[in-house]
Amino acid sequence: MGSAVVERFLERNRAQAAVLMAPVPPSGILGATMKIALTEPAFFDRQGRASRGEYTPEALRTIRDVYYSRETGTDDLIRFGRFFQSESRRAILDLTLLAMRVRLPRAALPVLVVGGEADALFPPAGLPFTAARWQAEVAVIPRAGHTLMLDAHWQIAAQRIATWIERAVQRAAAPGSSTD
């Protein structure tokens, strides 16, 4: 949901650049919600239990299957468990109806759209749709899941983002750039 917050911010505010990590697709979350409901029918119950500190083996497996890569260890899932919380109903409604929002003109700025190759929530095939809205570069992190910052492959994601930021700074400082 963090990328949706960044996109909303950019509708009315300026920034030098943006990184959208595992973004909600322009079509909203309805498709992802339906896919999870059909492929992992116990997910919503298990996610709710995990957000209350009930870390059953089934709940942890389901959380891993949806949000993380297979390489993310059970100890890490339990450690991250204190950050699990129920989703905001208002946010869920807003993101479900995202496709119906009137889109304001977008400012021209460098944007990187990053997703995990193993993201079960928003698969990498959807990243180009978000990237097209921003004329952005796409980066797919091999074997990473949805939760890029906590996934076992977080260092690869962080390095890819850091490299992109360094290049964006160099381009902005180059003679003839739009900041001159």
What spans do the regions from the language model cover?
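Short, structured coil segments at secondary-structure junctions
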Residues: R14, R133-W134
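Glycine-rich nucleophile elbow surrounding the catalytic serine of serine-hydrolase chemistry
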Residues: M1-R8
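The feature captures the conserved acid-bearing segment of alpha/beta-hydrolase catalytic domains
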Residues: M100-R106
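Conserved alpha/beta-hydrolase catalytic His-Asp/Glu region
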Residues: E54-I92
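Flexible "cap/lid" loop of the alpha/beta hydrolase fold
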Residues: R14-A50, A91-L95
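Short beta-strand/loop motif that positions the catalytic acidic residue
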Residues: A107, V113-G115, D119
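Conserved alpha/beta-hydrolase "acid-adjacent" motif
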Residues: A120-G126
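Catalytic active-site module of serine/aspartate enzymes centered on a nucleophile-bearing elbow/loop
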Residues: Q135-D180
